[in-house]
Design a protein with these regions (language model features):
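Generic, well-ordered alpha-helical scaffold segments in large soluble proteins
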Residues: 106-114, 141-145, 175-182, 203, ...
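Short Gly/Ser/Thr- and Asp/Glu-enriched loop/turn motifs at secondary-structure junctions
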Residues: 120-122, 157, 373-380, 418-420, ...
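N-terminal entrance/gating region of PLP-dependent enzymes' catalytic architecture
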Residues: 2-6, 10-122, 405-406, 443, ...
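Active-site C-terminal subdomain of aminotransferase-like
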Residues: 251, 259-262, 266-379, 384-388
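PLP-dependent enzyme catalytic core of the Aspartate aminotransferase-like
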Residues: 236, 417-469
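Conserved PLP-binding catalytic core of the aspartate aminotransferase-like
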Residues: 369-405, 429, 467-468
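Conserved PLP-enzyme active-site core in the AAT-like
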Residues: 129-307, 312
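A generic structural motif
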Residues: 217, 339-342, 387-389, 429-433
């Protein structure tokens, strides 16, 4: 049974086939209607199969109007052509596709240089299916290093723990669950919606495998204070001797800060930062799915975690949770690095930030909303209803915007700000100022009707919207 059941109960039914779908024979089209939940008895003409799938997908949301996702929804046609040329290339077959493997190696070296690694040419890193897998790999390395340091106590009474803000992406909770690590969360407090450096250091002990810093938070787009965190952990080590490494989850900010916040020290310039991940298919500007994980040196990634596989004629080192995966996204990442360079990335990311800050200011000017963030770190901002607004809530706004095609998530913050519900807007490459103007126009048109409501209409907030951050 599939884990995701969808909003409605699925019933077995034949698909409806237009007579013209049957290629040269209109009558055949009506006779070839396939079932939906079992394999058809016979084949269909390719045009018929295509049209059936194409028409069903028309009911999906418009990706360009999806202000919930961080994922890249537009690339140049040339990138699409390159990806199509690589559809049959398996990334694991490095001996058969040596140039694809070389492009992966170059991407790692480019990221190492971008993130100020001590020795970019020899930095250890790999591509992944996304930043979630990259986080899993980084977490495994943190745990294995802790196990090596505590071989005399593990797996006895010692239980490893990982420190992070309550705002972390769900992949970190999965990591702790799958690899039996105790998660220790720093809650939100007041107007602080992410990890506090000193609070994180206070949670550390001899069983702490590391601290995760988010650049930036998916809840509101803010950067966590990586340098302050490292300073607090330096002080902890000086007092107690406990040495705790830091992993920076730069799923989005890892491809924003190097171009727009060059003076911000968050990366391998900080000796305590052991590893960094980013998502190529977010602000790396590549279609899903590709991510990257880098370690500052070979000591940060235990050699025992790297498998060497004699497969199809070559000895290949691999560090991944899967085996076969497409090479097209890695090729697309290299294309984008070549196509844009530093100046191009800076221009694209600055355009997204300009749209975000401008849109946030216009929403604030409507008078019905209060900004939590302004899109001046990640090009992402969160806002809630103003104190005087009682006729509707953020869930009503999200639902009504969806009627106009806009996908804007509404959700409640975690501990200790469960009282706060917000809307979040993600501005990406392809979400232009013109689209932002249309968004404000639609939101403005909705307000008079929302203001006339006697009270918020959302009773089941969990059913009102989905938020997969």
């Amino acid at each position: 049974m599939p884990l995701h059941k969808g909003p409605q109960k699925h019933q077995e039914r034949p698909m409806s086939v237009n007579p013209f779908f049957g290629e040269a024979n209109p009558v055949a089209g009506m006779a070839e209607a396939p079932p939906t939940h079992r394999l058809p008895d016979g084949p269909l003409p390719p045009t018929t199969a295509y049209q059936l799938v194409h028409d069903e997908l028309m009911l999906d949301g418009n990706a360009r109007l999806n202000l919930a996702t961080f994922v890249t929804t537009w690339m140049e046609p040339q990138a699409g052509i390159l990806m199509a040329e690589c559809d049959d290339k398996n990334m694991i077959d490095k001996d058969e596709y040596p140039r694809t493997a070389e492009l992966e190696r170059r991407c790692v070296a480019m990221l190492a240089d971008l993130w100020n690694a001590p020795d970019p040419a020899n930095t250890v890193g790999c591509s992944t299916t996304g930043s979630s897998e990259a986080c899993m790999l980084a977490g495994m390395a943190l745990k294995r290093r802790w196990m090596q340091r505590n071989a005399d106590r593990y797996p006895g009474a010692a239980r490893p723990n990982l420190i992070m803000g309550i705002n972390v992406q769900v992949c970190w909770e999965k990591f702790c669950n799958f690899w039996e690590v105790e998660p220790r969360f720093v809650p939100m407090e007041g107007d602080r919606y992410h990890l506090d450096a000193q609070a994180a250091a206070d949670l550390c002990d001899e069983n702490t495998i590391g601290v995760v810093a988010i650049l930036g938070s998916t809840f509101d787009g803010s950067y966590e204070p990586v340098a302050d965190l490292c300073a607090a952990l330096d002080a902890l080590q000086e007092r107690t001797g406990i040495d705790v490494p830091v992993h920076v989850d730069g799923a989005s900010g890892g491809m924003i800060a190097p171009f727009l916040d060059e003076d911000l020290v968050w990366d391998f310039r900080l000796p305590r930062v052991a590893s960094i991940n980013t998502s190529g298919h977010k602000y790396g500007l590549v279609y899903p799915g590709v991510g990257w994980a880098l370690w500052r040196d070979k000591e940060a990634l235990p050699e025992e975690l790297v498998f060497r596989v004699n497969y199809l004629g070559g000895d290949m080192p691999t560090f991944a949770l899967n085996f076969s995966r497409p090479g097209a996204q890695v090729v697309a990442q290299y294309y984008t690095f070549l196509r844009l360079g530093r100046d191009g990335y800076r221009a694209v990311q600055q355009a997204s930030r300009d749209v975000a800050t401008g849109l946030a200011a216009r929403i604030e000017a409507l008078g019905d909303f209060r900004l939590l963030t302004r899109g001046d770190e990640l090009p992402v901002f969160a806002f809630t209803t103003a104190d005087h607004v009682t006729a509707y809530d953020v869930f009503d706004v999200s639902r009504r915007l969806r009627e106009s095609g806009w996908l804007v998530p509404a959700y409640t913050f975690p501990a200790n700000r469960e009282d706060l519900s917000v809307l979040r807007v993600v501005c990406r490459n392809g979400f232009s100022k013109d689209l932002a103007d249309l968004f404000v126009d639609d939101l403005t048109r909705l307000l008079p009707e929302l203001r006339r409501q006697p009270h918020p209409l959302t009773h089941d907030k969990e059913a009102a919207t989905s938020f997969h951050h």
